[in-house]
C-alpha cells in the first residue's frame, strides 16, 4: 500500500525557514516529502559545465540535506523533466497535494501549468505561494487596477501598501516534525548531472548590518569589498528570506529597501508584460534601432579589452568571478549599447550566462534601462562617459588596478571608440529611428 503524503517542491526557495509554501505543506496532518528536480530542460541549455549557479544550487541542497537528516528526513533529488519526475512520484506515493512557491518567468509559468494539469488529472491538488518577492503580480497597482510602468509612483504605493499589510512570517522551521521520516538518500554529484565541481566559494548568506547602515554612501564604489551586500545570488535561489531581509532593511536603510522595491518592480513587469522575457523591447519603437552588431567589437567587450579601464575591469571581474558591481553593470551595459551600438539582447544573453546572481526579471530590466527601451528607462540621450564615471566612482583607480593591472602600460589597448564620436553617432541613430517610428 502506498503511503499518503504531501510533497513540497523546492525551486527558488532553497531553505527550510520562513518558507511560505513549505509552511503551508507542513501545516497539514500528512507527512511532507521534500523534493528538488534538476530540470534537464534548463541544464541542457547551459553550455559551460563549470556553471557556478549549478554548483551553488548543489551546495545549497547539500546544506538542506544535512539539516533534514538531523531530523530523520531526507531530500529527494531527481534529474529529468518535472513532468517525467511527477509521473514517477504519482506511482511511488499516494499524493494528496503538491506545494511550491510562485515563479514568474515565462518558462516557469508554462512548466507549472503543465504540472498542474498532470496532477489534476490524477486528483492531486497543486498549491503555489508567494515567497520570492514582497508584492507580486497586481498587488501594487494604479488606482484603476492597471500595473505601474514608472518606478517612483510604484515605489510610493509599494511603501504605503507595506505600512498597511506588514510583512508576514512563515515559520516553517517550527513544523519540522511533519517531514516524512526516511533514511538518508544519496545526493547526486555535480559530475553525475554533467557538471564540474571546482570547489567554488560563494558570498555569505548573512545580511551585514554595517553594509546596510552605510549602503547609501558606499553602494556606488566598486573597490569596496563591503559596499554592497552580495546577497543577490541568495535572493535568486531563496537561500535567504526576502521577507526577513526587507524587515531588516526597513529598520536600517531606506536606500537598501529601495533596491528590494526595484526587484519587486521588475518581477511585476515581467509577469504583466511577458514579452520582455521573450526578447522584445518594452517600448516597441526601440525595436527599430539599426544596431551595428560588430562581432569583433562584441568580443573585445566580452573579454574586457575595450581600452576603457572601468569597462574592462567590470567585464574581467564578471568573467573571473561571476559577479560585477551594480554601478559597473550600468557602465558596461551603456558602453555596449550606446558606444558600440550593439543590440542590448547580446549583452543581456552574455550576462545571463555569466552572472552568479542572474535573474531574468532584473537582468532584462537593467539591460532595457541601459538601452532606453525599457519602462522608466534612461532617456536615449543619456550616454555614460566611462572616464567621468571613473573619476566619480573609482578616482584612485583601486578597482581598475585590481582587474586591469596593465591599464597604464603601453601594452594596454587604445580606446576602441572615442566617447564624443560614439555619443554623436548613437544620438543620430536613435533620433532617426525613433522619428520614423
Region roles according to the model:
Residues 1-162, 252, 316, 428-433, ...:
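Trp/Phe/Arg-rich N-terminal binding region typifying the photolyase-homology
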Residues 8, 324-326, 420:
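Short alpha-helical segments used as structural interaction elements across diverse proteins
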Residues 12, 112-113, 264, 328-330, ...:
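Hydrophobic alpha-helical segments, especially transmembrane helices
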Residues 21, 60, 64, 208, ...:
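Alpha-helical packing segments of well-folded alpha/beta enzyme cores
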Residues 47, 51-55, 202, 301, ...:
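Charge-dense, low-complexity intrinsically disordered segments
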Residues 124, 145-286, 389-437:
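Glycine/tryptophan-enriched, flexible segments
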Residues 124, 224-401:
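Active-site-proximal binding-pocket segments
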